[in-house]
């Protein structure tokens, strides 16, 4: 664990067992800097990772054993909901930096390729957070958001703001280039997955925000951001990009342990 005043947890979980949170499928707080609304000179280039040695990839079983008790299912899918969203916030931060760097570089290609990979990673997190059965979502997750705020909405996510236009499919300056075309394809895939997850979890199609009278909605964006961060155990402090990446890697290792045992859809 970092010895600095922000107390970020960056060590990777051990490979031979669970080492995230205080118990299997426990949670940890995430510490992020403020969202990257502007280019930051002190942020390293966001580039694609080197391929794994030998091209090896970790498999993700589609299914696995069902949790034996409702309490175990609630714990597992609560972990996925919170930790998967925390991963998404870190991905959005890196995506925002890569977007700024693409605008600033004479050759935006490396940044666009990184943005394509990050968009695919975000889509994977949608599948992960949305893997819970409908009854767990309706009985546990949706009520927890309602208790946090009656109009709780994903549109309040602070880290989404810098990448909102990109992820909503607006044209970029590079849409006619090969790299820009591949990025646009990934954004379209994200929209398909997002629509599918929403249709599965909320068959009626109405969010908490849509079900709430306007008088119950916070009108101050700062309050919205605080409420949203608080729900997902996310703190804000001036932490370097390297610590953001290490916190992301720590959570990815925990997710990998989870799906290797339980599959993406346990008991399906």
What residue spans do the PLM features occupy?
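Surface-exposed peri-terminal alpha-helical interaction modules
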Residues: 1-268
